[in-house]
Curated annotation (Swiss-Prot):
Purpose: Participates in the formation of a gel matrix (sperm coagulum) entrapping the accessory gland secretions and ejaculated spermatozoa.
PANTHER family: SEMENOGELIN-2 (PTHR10547:SF6), SEMENOGELIN/SEMINAL VESICLE SECRETORY PROTEIN (PTHR10547)
Location in or out of the cell: Secreted
Composition-biased stretches (Polar residues): 31-40, 137-158, 174-194, 325-334, 372-397, 445-455
Organism: Gorilla gorilla gorilla
Signal peptide: 1-23
UniProt protein name: Semenogelin-2
GO BP term, pick one: sperm capacitation
Gene: SEMG2
Length: 474
């Protein structure tokens, strides 16, 4: 009975303090109601004394209440109070206070009335964030396995007010660790999706050869030869809190996120020769060399729409993070007419560079593609040695010849493919479409060679060759 009376008195003190705060915010900053001061230090002793007597009547169990107050910025008042109570532990109270001027708001007297009725071993933390009239409350009970002793001794409340926030262009992740429990919240982002669904970790050696030949000379043959040699393969399926959703369109929309992480020496060689004229020759050469540079290309929300493409469209979305030495050589050779020749040559060499291509939320729409569109979606994280060879020769017309050759070789690498929940919508494709999303994290030595010759007319010749070689990469 005595404890109930003391608790009621403590609640009355809290109400008086709150009335004082509201009176100060209402415009009477200089004059406060009677019985209350700007900093309620005089009433603090009775308040805590009442709660100590109340807690002393309890035989088992303990609870801890932590108050965090954020008063309006216009009042220049931010006050935090950390109150830790341990029952049957000689009434020890740990209080940390930070006053920056102004008054305090006590908004959780109802929570106190509910927390003291809890049984033994229950531990509650009440955090109130009050900014501009909005209050966010989070109640956690992480440490239920600590207070199982009858006396309730040894209970400690740990609270770390650290928040790690990652804002990646439509992907907002907020990780807050409180009392050893981490909570992830997404705020301020219209698009929130976690892209971790499937993991393949290859530790030792992996050799993959894929051959796919398409011949359309009156008959159709399809031969696929796949060899996989690997050991210590781990597949993990991660189900995120938010599923990937495809919006902003009714059909033919796919979202890609590609990531390529290379940390040491890289050599990229890509050859692409374009011939578009009849007898003309046009050569473009671009050489780029940098040392200890950081390149970030943010391509958030890019939209690529391809309609009625007649000859071979290739869509590649990559995200590269390179921290070591890299060489990129791109040569593009393609022939669309009989005798035209067009050459575009680009060599890229950088030392200790960081390239980061963020292609979050990119949307590619392909409609009415008549001949062969290639779109690649993979995510690779390689820790061992792997060798991948993909050969796709195909013939689409009588005298046409189309060959796609991809040679991939790496050692001491880690391969990670996340292909869960990926959605790929393509409509109206008449001849063979391949969709690939690549995300590569390379920690060892890798060598990639991609050769794509393709021919779409009777005697035309189109060749796309890309060789990728890297050594001592992390």
């Amino acid at each position: 009975m005595k404890s109930i009376i003391l608790f009621v008195l403590s609640l009355l003190l809290i109400l008086e303090k709150q009335a004082a705060v509201m009176g100060q915010k209402g415009g009477s900053k200089g004059q406060l109601p009677s019985g209350s001061s700007q900093f309620p230090h005089g009433q603090k002793g009775q308040h805590y004394f009442g709660q100590k007597d109340q807690q002393h009547t309890k035989s088992k169990g303990s609870f801890s209440i932590q108050h965090t107050y954020h008063v309006d910025i216009n009042d220049h008042d931010r006050t935090r109070k950390s109150q830790q109570y341990d029952l049957n532990a000689l009434h020890k109270a740990t209080k940390s206070k930070q006053h920056l001027g102004g008054s305090q708001q006590l908004l959780n007297y109802k929570q106190e009335g509910r927390d003291h009725d809890k049984s033994k071993g229950h531990f509650h933390m009440i955090v109130i964030h009050h900014k501009g009239g909005q209050a966010h409350r989070g109640t956690q009970n992480p440490s239920q396995d600590q207070g199982n002793s009858p006396s309730g001794k040894g209970l400690s409340s740990q609270y770390s007010n650290t928040e790690k926030r990652l804002w990646v262009h439509g992907l907002s992740k907020e990780q807050a660790s409180a009392s050893g429990a981490q909570k992830g919240r997404t705020q301020g982002g219209s698009q929130s999706s976690y892209v971790l669904q499937t993991e393949e970790l290859v530790v030792n050696k992996q050799q993959r050869e894929t051959k796919n030949s398409h011949q359309n000379k009156g008959h159709y043959q399809n031969a696929v030869d796949v060899r996989e040699e690997h050991s210590s393969k781990l597949q993990t399926s991660l189900h995120p809190a938010h599923q990937d959703r495809l919006q902003h369109g009714s059909k033919d929309i796919f979202t890609t996120q590609d990531e390529l992480l290379v940390y040491n020496k890289n050599q990229h060689q890509t050859k692409n020769l374009n011939q578009d004229q009849e007898h003309g020759q046009k050569a473009h050469k671009i050489s780029y060399q940098s040392s200890r540079t950081e390149e970030r290309q943010l391509n958030h929300g890019e939209k690529s729409v391809q309609k009625d493409v007649s000859k071979g469209s290739i869509s590649i979305q990559t995200e590269k993070k390179i921290h070591g030495k890299s060489q990129n050589q791109v040569t593009i050779h393609s022939q669309d007419q009989e005798h035209g020749h067009k050459e575009n040559k680009m060599s890229h060499q950088s030392s200790s560079t960081e390239e980061r291509h963020l292609n979050c939320g990119e949307k590619g729409i392909q409609k009415g593609v008549s001949k062969g569109s290639i779109s690649i979606q993979t995510e690779e994280q390689i820790h061992g040695k792997s060798q991948n060879q993909v050969r796709i020769p195909s013939q689409a017309q009588e005298y046409g010849h189309k060959e796609n050759k991809i040679s991939y070789r790496s050692s001491s690498t880690e391969e990670r493919r996340l292909n869960s929940g990926e959605k790929d919508v393509q409509k109206g494709v008449s001849k063979g479409s391949i969709s690939i999303q690549t995300e590569e994290k390379i920690h060892g030595k890798s060598q990639n060679q991609v050769t794509i010759p393709s021919q779409d007319q009777e005697h035309g010749h189109k060749e796309n060759k890309m060789s990728y070689q890297s050594s001592s990469t992390e």
